[in-house]
Amino acid sequence: MQQGGNAERQAGRRTILKAAGASLAVAGLGATATACGGGTGSGDGTVTIRYSWWGAEDRAERINKTIALFEKKYPKIKVKTDFQPYTDFWKKFNTQASGGNPPDVFQNAIGFLRKYDAKNVLLDLGGQVQAGNLSMDGFRAGLEKFGEIDGKLLGVPVGSNSMALVIDKPVYTRAGIKPEQGWTWDDFDEAMTRVRDRTGRAGDSGMYGVMYLYDLYLRQNGKAFFTEDGLGFTEADLTTWWTRAERGVRSGLYADAKKVAQIKPKSALSAELAGSEFTWDNFTVRYTSEGKSEYGLAPIPTTDGKRTGQYLGSLMLSAYKRTEHPKEVAQFIDFMVHDPEVAKIMGYDRGVPTTQAQYDAYRPTDPVNKAIAAYEESLVEAGVLEQITPHPNGADICEAAFLRIAEEMALGSRSVEEAVEQFFTESKTALAG
């Protein structure tokens, strides 16, 4: 959920979104992380905590401004920062965690909660809530529950987003398509055909590797990508999904996979290879930055004309279980999710603010971010939002495998049958670990 999801892994440092969701980055603005485990202290009572995240340089600039506000309010707490691109962040974090040297506080996503809880890395912040150092009041749409696993508060959400179909609005206009809430997958297929036939462009960039989209499709049909301890679908289910995708690539309904690979890190949508792309709603800002067209948000297609299977995803902040400064870390997280000035600085960089105070403090005036807010509000009003799918230990590895193997299938390196077999083999190993 940008959260670190499919699109994020494909985006590069100069093309990634500048004001929304989960973005990629290169190494650091400001101070870098200390080499010792946990935070540090000084003789005058000042403590230093380490804070790491994945994100673009624009995100780093915003975060550094919020840290300056925090240090002004809490002059005895200093914050040292470190950030990398998404994949590099998790490689480094895994190494740090294995060596007992992770940052005191760090950006996180739901796919990693059980993994690092099982490794005794994550602090249960519930104790800090009870101590009055962290408030879980005032969150929108039940988002305060998002970081709870097995009764433990392992993460605090900082921004919400949801899956959407991002469309090239002029292309859809030329094709005569007006997606509406409740449209079906058959309607979607017809729309892709019209885009191809009337504009000469592929209808979609290729949805086959987007794990979170397939999860919605499964949820529409009474299943889910994950259960509490494994996969929630069969090889036959995935064969049907990827066979449909393979046909779409061959017929030109989905963008040429070779061309999509060639233009990375730019998206197929902003590169004008396709008329739409399934991703997190806040990636609209990325496409606006990358491309020359006007982009909008369309509803997720449905199986029965009603259920979309959607939920609000979120980036979150988590803490190291053995941090030397749990109180200060909790105060830092509390400040970052509740302070109105933080919202004004961050905007929708990490999604729509999760607390009502921050949501009210930042009301966008530009059309792109206004559309993102309106889209999420429409989901709440339509009553389509459900509880998020569980993410067992190993979910992050399954997500990466799903994307990689789907791309290999689309490129012709694997047959559908081989791709399905390979995914289930890798997932079985990941989820057993």
Task: Pin down the residues of each PLM region.
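C-terminal capping/gating helix-and-loop segments adjacent to ligand/active sites or protein-protein/ligand interfaces
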Residues: A373-E426
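Extracytoplasmic/periplasmic substrate-recognition and gating elements
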Residues: A68-K73, A175, T243, R250-Y254, ...
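Extracytoplasmic "Venus flytrap"/periplasmic binding protein-like
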Residues: L69, K73-G138, R174-G176, K266-S276, ...
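A structural signal for short loop-to-beta-strand junctions that line the ligand-binding cleft
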Residues: Q96, P103-D104, N133-V171, K306-G309, ...
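Mature extracytoplasmic/periplasmic domains
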Residues: V285, L315-D396
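Glycine-centered hinge/linker elements that transmit conformational signals in sensory
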Residues: M192, G230-K258
